[in-house]
Amino acid sequence: MRATLRILCALTFLVSCSRGARVVSGQTVCQGNPEHPCYKIAYFKDVSSRVAFWEALQACEMDGGSLLSIENTAEQKHIEHLLRELSVSSSTGPASITDGDFWIGLTREEGDNAQEPGAFASCPNLYRWTDGSVSLFRNWYADEPSCGGEACVVMYHQPTALAGPGGPYLYQWNDDRCNMKHNFICKYEPESHLVKVQSDRPGGHDVDLSTEDKEDRRTPPTDEDESPRLIIAGPSSMLLIYVIIPTIPLLLLILVASGTCCFQMLSKSKPRTKTSVNQSTLWISKTPKIDSGMEV
């Protein structure tokens, strides 16, 4: 859970530090047609910040989306275009993108027949999309999936890698161990579906879709060779919540420490009881005694 919150916080930081026309890590990207889904690419240049498959899945779901499913060749090409446009922007300009594969929402379901004879041959048919999509589109590299202990799927993104026996690795799919650390891509429902869901609710027919960051609606290009125009949506307001949540343990620690200090200070300032001394019991009396037996 904490790892997922750190991911969302990192994405929020990247979005808050970057505003530009290109595709930016942590920013929601939508096409001009509201019937098309939106995407969010989570790219971490620092390898130690990358996450395992199930952490990526949880991060997307907590943000209202799902780990990427790819329905057809057109969507595969669109994701490739987004990755080519990817940049991690800073105040001085875009930084270089290093090698790093991306988790997609395809994983192998281990059934009762996994150990039966011939199960290895049917292994590619055991892969399912985590968002419930029934699409059979696959973009495996030549000798993939290798199956075995590798049950989760990544999209190759290693621009510096040389082509292998099956051709270039870039954007092809590979099965990997689910605990490996990679980048990931989230996918969100089309805007028209979200509007329909809201309008179906009681009192939801007059839905105001205007926001502070209004999207620039553009007509999708008709030329297949032309790069698709993109719309960069504002960062999800829900991500801001996860900036506050991780600070709760720190606030509790400060509160406990403050209480402990106050308790110690009060203990030191408490007056101590002193034993009263009865002056009459002192062996030296201030009033001298008169010896009645002395005669002058």
UniProtKB/Swiss-Prot annotation:
Signal peptide range in chain numbering: 1-20
Record Gene3D superfamilies: Mannose-Binding Protein A, subunit A (3.10.100.10)
Keywords: Lectin, Membrane, Neurogenesis, Signal, Transmembrane, Transmembrane helix
SUPFAM superfamilies (alphabetical): C-type lectin-like (SSF56436)
GO cellular component: cytoplasm; membrane
Annotated segments matching region Disordered: 197-229
Matches recorded under Pfam families: Lectin_C
Function: Plays a role in the development of the nervous system such as in neurite outgrowth and elongation. Involved in motor axon growth and guidance. Required for correct interactions of motor axons with the horizontal myoseptum.
Protein name (record): Chondrolectin
Gene source species: Danio rerio (Zebrafish)
